[in-house]
Swiss-Prot record:
Functional description taken from the UniProt entry: Required for accurate and efficient protein synthesis under certain stress conditions. May act as a fidelity factor of the translation reaction, by catalyzing a one-codon backward translocation of tRNAs on improperly translocated ribosomes. Back-translocation proceeds from a post-translocation (POST) complex to a pre-translocation (PRE) complex, thus giving elongation factor G a second chance to translocate the tRNAs correctly. Binds to ribosomes in a GTP-dependent manner.
Occurrences of domain tr-type G (ranges): 4-186
GO BP of this protein: positive regulation of translation
Protein biosynthesis among keywords: yes
Catalysed reactions, as listed in the record: GTP + H2O = GDP + phosphate + H(+)
Membrane topology label: Peripheral membrane protein
HAMAP family for the chain: LepA (MF_00071)
Species, as recorded: Trichlorobacter lovleyi (strain ATCC BAA-1151 / DSM 17278 / SZ)
Protein name from the UniProt record: Elongation factor 4
GO CC terms, sorted: plasma membrane
UniProt keyword list: Cell inner membrane, Cell membrane, GTP-binding, Hydrolase, Membrane, Nucleotide-binding, Protein biosynthesis
Amino acid sequence: MDISKIRNFSIIAHIDHGKSTLADRLLEYTGALTAREMQSQFLDKMDLERERGITIKAQTVRLNYTADDGNTYVLNLIDTPGHVDFTYEVSRSLAACEGGLLVVDASQGVEAQTLANVYLALDNDLEVFPVLNKIDLPAAEPERVKHEIEEIIGIDAHDAVLASAKEGIGTREILEEIVKKIPAPQGDVAAPLKALLFDSWYDQYQGVIILVRLFEGSLKKGDKIQLMSTNKAYEALKVGVFSPVMVEVPQLTAGEVGFVIAGIKDVADAKVGDTVTLLHRQCAEMLGGFKEVKPMVFSGLYPIDTAQYEQLRDALAKLKLNDSSFSFEPETSVALGFGFRCGFLGLLHMEIIQERLEREFGLDLITTAPTVVYRVHKMNGDVYSIQSANQMPELQSTEYLEEPFILAHIHVPNDYVGGVLALCEDKRGVQREIKYLTPTRVMIIYELPLNEIVLDFYDRLKSITKGYASLDYEHLEYRRSDLVRMNVLINGEVVDALSLILHRDKAYFRGRDLVSKMKELISRQMFEVAIQAAIGSKIIARETVKAMRKDVLAKCYGGDITRKRKLLEKQKEGKKRMKNVGNVELPQEAFLAILKVDDK
């Protein structure tokens, strides 16, 4: 194939700015799909992606387009996720491209994640050109948004394409711009194979399918390939492209994007960002710029029915096949039994994994409160990391604790600035700067502790700003903090699954709110139930669920007071004995209460 006729591009956009719909229009216009096969958001294969209107996994599709100059070009669209948790997926997809379409909603303007992804694209030396989407909306202000793009991102936007993916306006102009503005890939077909593995997933019939972008050389069916980070060798059983269904081709050459099926059994061997080369004719060095992704948020997942433990293990292993950024290891809890401690990139990632477990595998799960990775500095100089409150050592042997901080960029309309600043201060934030991007839009930059973000920050930010805020964050460093472990005791017994690590200043309020919430959720027993929050041996809050009372005097119509007293004493003794041996059933809502308690 003539390498000068290939264009590899991706679409960069904030959530809800119309990226997947635009991809649909490009598929339709180039004839990759007939109207009958068309379903909205074609590239979002998971139901979950379509329902939430977000793109989770990277997808690719090859489009054939005959341009105005009479030549037929091969356009490889590499669809990227737009959410902050999936930044690594975005960086891999972008590394496989030469250019990108920056899609901005003409009514909303530049949002926080648009910025983050554009900077990633510019770091990868991509040629980026702007497209203003949704120009059919009455609220669209193309001139203001063009000005915003130039001011904030610094990309020339005077000739930005005006489009409406929903109405199909501007599709041809976008395809022409792709051909004219995005450079053709460079690469020597005769050189040894050097290909970037930018996504992989597991197919139950064919094993691991890997998506590759060839930078040099060629690859055909039957070639022996090697993955350079693990040095494992495989035979390429099938090579092909997505157009948009899988189509086998005789060979892939430099500049092309396609899939390889090589009988790989484990996705952990097909690391995203790895370099694929030929076993007997290797390239000199790996492609650079890739890192192992580390989970930032941890949470315990336990089956409500303990018989589902093995099913949960299998389900997690299957999800891990498709998601190299997700980790899990077994753990046990006195209150919840056997389960797994899982690591996620962020909150959305956690919700999605959880929802997929329940939806695709039919599991009923209890989730413990999310935590982040803390560093413990012991008196003897040892330093180690902990992921849950149960791993936290006694304070006597600990010199100090450190927690991760993030740098948050929050874009909000200026009417809501006061509320957002109050929220950030409440979450122990340190203000860096406030920038007026336009007279009506403000960018607020704050340093915030990650553990304040993981619980309910995003929900509260959205409710304060009526849904208009957008948030993007990057990790800064670990900082020393006055952190304590707060335990919840039910009738004097610590419930390990409800323990939390939090800042000492917040502990009293948090404890008080949590026990009052628990009081509402725990049903009344035949005996009194004491719910306490404690730091060490000091009780900081308490609520009592009163016992149900049977009227033992009902059958005494008169008679002596001593008779009544005897019956009451007998009841009291019985309740006391019951309290010693009685167990309290904690409903699933009790564990969710931790996530939902607002720091008022």
